[in-house]
Amino acid sequence: MKKDIHPEYREVVFQDISTDFSFLTRSTVKTDETITWQDGNEYPLVKIEVSSRSHPFFTGKQRVVHSGGQVDRFRKRFGMTRGSSSQ
């Protein structure tokens, strides 16, 4: 196997920003932020918007998380409104 072609596989903390839930796992994701975990060691931190703790499929609750999607930006840019147009 060739050396130095694969990203570093390391322990990383993922933090769900909507529920403040964090979990430690392994990943190749790159990040500049770090956090001190419960074991006293410092790990890279990745902030995510949705995890199993906040996703409606896993929680059974409907929750509106709107961060302004591409469709809204398109409609705003081209002056389109919702509904049918008159012909």
Curated annotation (Swiss-Prot):
Quaternary state and interactors: Part of the 50S ribosomal subunit.
Gene: rpmE2
Lineage of producing organism: Bacteria, Pseudomonadati, Pseudomonadota, Gammaproteobacteria, Chromatiales
Keyword Ribonucleoprotein belongs to the record: yes
Family from the record: Belongs to the bacterial ribosomal protein bL31 family. Type B subfamily.
GO cellular component: ribonucleoprotein complex; ribosome
GO biological process, one term: translation
UniProt KW keywords: Ribonucleoprotein, Ribosomal protein
PROSITE patterns for this protein: RIBOSOMAL_L31
InterPro entries cross-referenced by the UniProt entry: Ribosomal_bL28/bL31-like_sf, Ribosomal_bL31, Ribosomal_bL31_B, Ribosomal_bL31_sf
Gene Ontology MF terms: structural constituent of ribosome
Official protein name in the record: Large ribosomal subunit protein bL31B
Species name: Halorhodospira halophila (strain DSM 244 / SL1) (Ectothiorhodospira halophila (strain DSM 244 / SL1))
